[in-house]
């Protein structure tokens, strides 16, 4: 749990770091649909990642949430998710990277001198990382890594990729399990042409073809522990996404509320129409609850896989509803890309329900942790039969 003064200092640091340059880089990135590497470099130079991580192997959840709020205020899913992916790769290295080689990569990433990304999903299985086809095998005192990753965000600008692969040392014909994670220099892979996407334009995402050798020190998580390592990174990303959604929803509600108070229809402002006013009040109440939940999780001081899954899927579904309703209240203007940014926000928000784990994958994690009340059931059923 973060001490109050320390968290206040971090908020102050974020306020200084997220300056007019960050706003300008974000606007340019949205126009060009390219992620600005200088943004991560800037956050590193400003000490944002260093202050967030300090010397800890595990993240300060309070600072994780505050950084997510700052990213969400930019109202750019491409920028927010890109920074959080870099930071989530740091999370993997901080906890699982034990060699001096990996510690050096992590330190560079914290300083903003290196950009990190994660290569997990493939055409074969999407979120099912047990069946990844990228293979890792021992060779010449290191590891040979071969495979194709389909969705690798930030790969066009990254220096290192945290690659999820299966070890086939025990059985070259295996097709399941023995998942490992290895750090692969981006200079040693072939990054394909970035995809054209529905939204999140600045989040450069491309397929990556891997056929290379890396030293033994590049192994982040040995065979059999890779799922634990990537799950840890995903939990970090999911918490960040939830915080970004909370902040971006609040911004959308505030802008829509201003529209409602200035726009007149049928002799009244839109806000004076009860149906619209109460609809917004409902959304505001639920966004408030999301923000309170994030602060509550931060107070516990622990990053938990199921909690991160639960808050991310809940936030993503709420975010989609909030942006859709705000766009609706803007009427025809909300549908015009040259008049408002509501359409862009609407397209961006869809990514939240897919990236970092789909709704169904996250609900399965929540379901696995549910506890039945057998005694309570017996008492209720017994009472009804009495």
Curated annotation (Swiss-Prot):
Induction cue: Induced by iron starvation conditions. Transcriptionally repressed by IdeR and iron.
Gene3D superfamilies (alphabetical): Acyl-CoA dehydrogenase/oxidase, N-terminal domain (1.10.540.10), Butyryl-CoA Dehydrogenase, subunit A, domain 2 (2.40.110.10), Butyryl-CoA Dehydrogenase, subunit A, domain 3 (1.20.140.10)
EC number(s) reported in the record: 1.3.99.-
Domain of life: Bacteria
Flavoprotein recorded as keyword: yes
Top EC class, one word: oxidoreductase
Cofactor: FAD
GO process annotations (BP): catechol-containing siderophore biosynthetic process; fatty acid beta-oxidation using acyl-CoA dehydrogenase
UniProt keyword Oxidoreductase, yes or no: yes
Molecular-function GO term, any one: enoyl-[acyl-carrier-protein] reductase (NADPH) activity
Pathway it works in: Siderophore biosynthesis; mycobactin biosynthesis
Record GO cellular component, one term: cytoplasm
Pfam family, one: Acyl-CoA_dh_1
This protein's UniProt keywords: FAD, Flavoprotein, Oxidoreductase
Similarity remark: Belongs to the acyl-CoA dehydrogenase family.
PANTHER family: LONG-CHAIN SPECIFIC ACYL-COA DEHYDROGENASE, MITOCHONDRIAL, MEDIUM-CHAIN SPECIFIC ACYL-COA DEHYDROGENASE, MITOCHONDRIAL-RELATED
Task performed by this protein: Catalyzes the dehydrogenation at the alpha-beta position of ACP-bound acyl chains. This results in the introduction of a double bond in the lipidic chain, which is further transferred to the epsilon-amino group of lysine residue in the mycobactin core by MbtK.
Name this polypeptide is given: Acyl-[acyl-carrier-protein] dehydrogenase MbtN
């Amino acid at each position: 749990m973060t001490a109050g003064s320390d968290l206040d200092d971090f908020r102050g640091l974020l306020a200084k770091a997220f300056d007019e340059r960050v706003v300008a880089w974000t606007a340019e990135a949205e126009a060009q649909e390219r992620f600005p590497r200088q943004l991560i470099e800037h956050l590193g130079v400003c000490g944002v990642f260093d202050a967030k991580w300090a010397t800890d192997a595990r993240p300060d959840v309070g600072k994780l949430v505050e950084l997510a709020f700052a990213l969400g205020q930019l109202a750019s899913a491409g920028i927010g998710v890109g920074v959080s992916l870099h930071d989530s790769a740091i999370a993997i290295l901080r906890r699982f990277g034990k060699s001096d080689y990996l510690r050096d990569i992590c330190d560079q990433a914290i300083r903003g001198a290196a950009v990190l990304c994660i290569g997990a999903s493939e055409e074969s299985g999407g979120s099912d990382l047990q069946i990844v086809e990228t293979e890792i095998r021992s060779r010449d005192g290191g590891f040979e890594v071969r495979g194709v990753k389909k969705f690798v965000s930030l790969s066009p600008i990254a220096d290192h990729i945290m690659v999820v692969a299966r070890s086939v040392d025990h059985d070259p014909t295996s097709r399941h399990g023995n998942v490992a994670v290895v750090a692969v220099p981006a200079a040693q892979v072939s990054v394909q042409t970035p995809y054209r996407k529905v939204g999140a334009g600045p989040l450069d995402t491309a397929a990556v073809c891997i056929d290379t050798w890396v030293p033994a020190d590049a192994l982040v998580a040995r065979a059999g522990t890779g799922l634990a390592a990537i799950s840890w990174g995903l939990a970090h990303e999911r918490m960040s996404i939830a915080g970004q959604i909370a902040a971006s929803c609040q911004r959308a509600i505030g802008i829509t509320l201003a529209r409602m108070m200035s726009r007149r229809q049928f002799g009244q402002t839109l806000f004076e129409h009860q149906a619209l006013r109460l609809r917004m009040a409902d959304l505001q109440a639920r966004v408030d609850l999301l923000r309170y939940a994030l602060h509550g999780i931060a107070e516990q001081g622990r990053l938990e896989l199921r909690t991160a899954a639960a808050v991310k899927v809940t936030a993503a579904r709420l975010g989609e509803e909030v942006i859709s309703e705000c766009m609706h209240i803007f009427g025809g203007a909300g549908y015009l890309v040259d008049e408002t940014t509501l359409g862009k926000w609407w397209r961006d928000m869809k990514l939240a329900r897919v990236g970092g784990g789909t709704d169904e994958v996250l609900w399965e994690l929540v379901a696995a942790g549910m506890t039945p009340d057998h005694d309570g059931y017996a008492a209720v059923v017994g009472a009804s039969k009495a």
